């Protein structure tokens, strides 16, 4: 009895196991068949729509020109071939391909509409079974934080719309719920994937805007380039000008003023020659005047420090008279001493020597001082204003002391 009961138990267990395995295998096989059928249908539909849209676009752009020969035949044959393909695969113009699985949408006018990147990625997410079967990507903490704000009651309208408008979501929902996943897990995973896709699109848009702003900021306009070029060209020039600006000379200069025109008009018979002055190292004009009334005249006072003026006058009788050598030697010595002193210590007050056209004598004038040149010229005129009696007295004195002067003159020579 015990052995019969054990054998019946084993047979019933094996039969039940076989039945359950067979049922599960049949269900799995049926599920795989449906997936393969749907996949083949989608691929066939996508291929047909893509070929039809491409053929229509190429046919519209290809224009047969009025040329002759082989080129015209080739273009016409290609146009006919594309027309046949378009007529075979394209739907009628009054129907629109209502399909969410392609990126090209046919319109009644025969044109196509392209999906953007966001729509294409959303379709790929909706038609991928891994979106609903696998755990969400990323950190689990982020998914848990998102679940804290998840409310399926607020998503009922959106869920109903997705089941109506999206065949891929409707097919996957029918297959997977409740066999593979629960109703709540199916929609939680889907909407979290959509949430991640939206975040990714937001980051992509932010990066694109930042790149556009950086490109616009790095591209200078023509006006900015010209301003930079002008500024770069003018700055070194200004620096060079500031560097090489010559300051006003600090060394005093000597000015020689010669009233030659007035002298030539007033004294046409006068002959003038120039002799360098030892003290001031300037040129002072000396005028020699032929006058029979004056034999010789020497100034009793020195006109200016370091200068020597000698005037020779010849009488009409033809007598050659020379001035006393002793005073001349003393003056020469004084002038040499003053010249050495002035070379060691340059004078701070520079004088300008002018040729006086009225008296024929060189008169010093202070540069920048009022009344100095006029006073000195008047003193000189007073010194040279001699009467005839004074001249005769001077001549007699010279004749009396002629011997002494001759000896002094020889010594001086």
From Swiss-Prot:
Matching InterPro entries: BSD_dom (IPR005607), BSD_dom_sf (IPR035925), BSD_domain-containing (IPR051494)
SUPFAM superfamilies: BSD domain-like
Any one of the GO CC terms: cytoplasm
Domain BSD: 146-198
Segments for region (Disordered): 208-228, 255-386
Compositionally biased tracts (Acidic residues): 376-386
Ranges annotated as biased composition (Low complexity): 274-287
Skewed-composition ranges (Polar residues): 297-322, 356-375
Positions with biased composition (Basic and acidic residues): 208-219, 255-271, 342-352
PANTHER family in UniProt: BSD DOMAIN-CONTAINING PROTEIN 1, SYNAPSE-ASSOCIATED PROTEIN
Name of this protein: BSD domain-containing protein 1-A
Gene designation per UniProt: bsdc1-a
